[in-house]
Amino acid sequence: SIMVPYVGSHDVPRLTSRADTGTNDAFNQWAEDGLPGQPGDVSAYNAAMQAYGWLLTTPGAPLLYYGDEYGEYGGADPDNRHMYRNESSWSIMETQLFENISELGKLRSESIALQRGEYSTRLAMANLLVYNMTHEDQVMSVVLNRGAPTSVGGFESNDIVRFGESSMLDGTLSVEAHSVTVIELDADIVVAPIYGCTNSTATNFDASATEDDGSC
């Protein structure tokens, strides 16, 4: 059997509305009660990215309720069943969320560790969670940071950031605030060839060239 984890569904109010700290109408379901509107604060979308960052990097076959990929808002059933909105009506925050979830979903589809790896916690704090997804052919490390910028050590020179804006230097990851980061551990580093003349006796010899281009 395969687990099907999910964050949103037709049984609960939309996640961005539940995460919208500026209102208390997320569980309203009828117009006369006052229904949630589109969140105007980025914190709701940051929370959604944390949730779907977890969903797309942990075991199981992740399920996304339609519209959650861009952060559709809505209260309790039936207000959580809005028609899917065309991207031309999305806010900048909704567009950014969609792009990030799409990119992370693509990475999952290409990563055997994210699809079938075994979960193990590396670090767990109030606002920071670091865990590995380990498969015999690949290991991915995931950093979920719902707080301020921070840093996480213990990485190696050939560990590569595959998703997120955080950066790696000398084994230390500088973690952006409210971010999701995925690092491939012990990654195969592919160096692009530098074409040029590799004949040291030629007049156009290029000492930096790694592959001859036939111009000698």
Which residues does each predicted region cover?
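Active-site and adjacent substrate-binding regions of carbohydrate-active enzymes
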Residues: 1-193
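Primarily marks secretory-pathway-exposed extracellular/lumenal segments that are disulfide-
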Residues: 189-216
